[in-house]
């Protein structure tokens, strides 16, 4: 993906491949793997999730994907926020009766996402607030002594505990999701214990990819969820526009 963004060719053996050629090879191999699960059925759509949606990158990926899968296959691009929204919406409703938190642990620290729903609006308007915590950047502990590791992990645990406590105190949170290999039991002790009090907590790495699949299905085969809940991203107008109308003798909104 870095080659695609930089529009840089790559040398493989004696041949030089353009970014589009490399992605086309990738898509063909990927489709070969999925053939065992689809039983030879044609794919209706391919969904890709990217941290940032860049037009040039998306255009190249769309061309490569369409060339590999065929023009009948729709190509969708979804942000991590949209994938988070779609994933949560397709979970049991008791998991999102209140706000939902997601902590994504990357190399540069923790990125948090908070899903909020305004259930007084029709359709239900959903917003996602984001925040970055660079102070949680993971350090290489391979050269540390056991005592140094313990001290570092304790400091990390206390820092994350402060982050979740500052948010959760006085608020209603139904569930929280921890993404990334850096969330381990080596350090995530007091913070995890606090987070699990009265909330459902899950850990994994494939939430965004699953959310992309749910989102693609909603675009191809819309369910009632698509009309009942609307996610307002940064590209959308953050306002509800409504008016009172007369239906017979009754006034409705």
How does the language model describe each region?
Residues 70-103, 207-225:
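Conserved phosphate-binding catalytic cores of ATP/NTP-utilizing and phosphoryl-transfer enzymes
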Residues 26, 60-67, 191, 211, ...:
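Alpha-helical scaffold elements adjacent to nucleotide-binding pockets in ATP/GTP-utilizing enzyme cores
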Residues 1-6, 88-130, 244:
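Gly/Thr-rich phosphate-binding beta-strand-loop-beta motif of the actin/hexokinase/Hsp70
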Residues 1-50, 54, 129-166, 173:
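Conserved phosphate-binding loops in N-terminal lobes of ATP-dependent enzymes
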């Amino acid at each position: 993906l870095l080659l695609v963004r930089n529009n840089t060719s790559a040398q493989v053996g004696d041949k030089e491949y353009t970014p589009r050629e490399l992605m086309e090879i990738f898509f063909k191999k990927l489709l070969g793997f999925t053939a065992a699960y689809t039983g030879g059925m044609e794919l209706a759509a391919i969904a890709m999730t990217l941290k940032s949606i860049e037009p040039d990158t998306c255009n190249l990926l769309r061309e490569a994907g369409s060339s590999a899968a065929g023009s009948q296959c729709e190509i969708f691009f979804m942000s991590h926020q949209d994938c988070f929204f779609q994933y949560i919406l397709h979970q049991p409703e008791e998991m999102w009766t209140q706000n939902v938190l997601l902590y994504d642990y990357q190399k540069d620290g923790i990125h948090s996402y908070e899903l909020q729903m305004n259930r007084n609006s029709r359709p239900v308007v959903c917003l996602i607030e984001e925040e970055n915590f660079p102070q949680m950047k993971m350090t290489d502990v391979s050269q540390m002594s056991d005592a140094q590791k313990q001290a570092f992990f304790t400091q990390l645990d206390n820092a994350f505990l402060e982050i979740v406590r500052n948010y959760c105190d006085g608020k209603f949170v139904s569930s929280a999701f921890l993404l990334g290999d850096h969330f381990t039991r080596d350090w995530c002790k007091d913070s995890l214990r606090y987070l699990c009090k009265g909330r459902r907590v899950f850990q994994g790495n494939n939430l965004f990819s699953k959310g992309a699949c749910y989102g693609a299905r909603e675009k191809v085969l819309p369910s009632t969820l698509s009309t009942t809940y609307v996610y307002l991203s940064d590209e959308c107008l953050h306002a509800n526009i409504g008016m009172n109308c007369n239906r017979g003798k009754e006034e409705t909104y």
